[in-house]
Amino acid sequence: MAAQDGKIDEGSQMRHILTSLAVAAAAFSLPAFALDEEPCGKSMVCASNPQSVADGVQAAGYKAVLSKSSTTGNPMIESAANGYNYSIFFYECEDGEKCGSIQFQISFEDDGANTLELANKWNSNKRFSQMAVADDKSLAVSYDVATIGGLNQKNFADVVDWWALMLGELNKFFKENPAPAAAAEAAVK
């Protein structure tokens, strides 16, 4: 960094400045998770009040079994729609409470068709849900919803309807993109 005459050369100085800026940018870009400190308003659906989420799912016409995640200790809800069982996970929680968001999620074990290409095909035209392939080749489809401040019943019913619609689309998508074994079996018939 120092030249032989004791002065800092311009290249070294520029690298030092750029490194400092990169470190500062990284520090400021870290997400700050907001805790929902306010009580959940009457007839609102809030991740900070897991029972309100379960009640909202039931009000939309679906089952909702509230429990705790064995992995995180955070609340979770088990439900079903369009022939699929799914979970609702709670995030940005402090000791399993004051959660800020929820994630509707369904997971599938590897059937030989769970590839990044399959996930990219789904993600290329789905706005409200994301498909991802894990290291173990399991496939997950999820839909994240922030609830800080709460959602009214009509808004939350719309969220649940969008998720149910995505599950119906998922069924159609899997029929159009069968696993290799299922595709081979269909070709034999």
Where are these regions (language model features)?
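Short, Lys/Arg-enriched N-terminal segments with co-localized hydrophobic residues
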Residues: 1-13
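Long, continuous compositionally biased terminal/linker segments
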Residues: 80-111
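A short, solvent-exposed beta-edge/loop patch
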Residues: 127-171
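Charge-rich, low-complexity N-terminal segments
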Residues: 33-83
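Sec-dependent signal peptide recognition
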Residues: 15-22
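Short, internal acidic amphipathic alpha-helical interface segments
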Residues: 36-38, 100-142
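Short, highly charged C-terminal tails/helix-capping segments
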Residues: 175-189
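N-terminal signal peptide c-region/cleavage motif recognized by signal peptidases
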Residues: 29-31
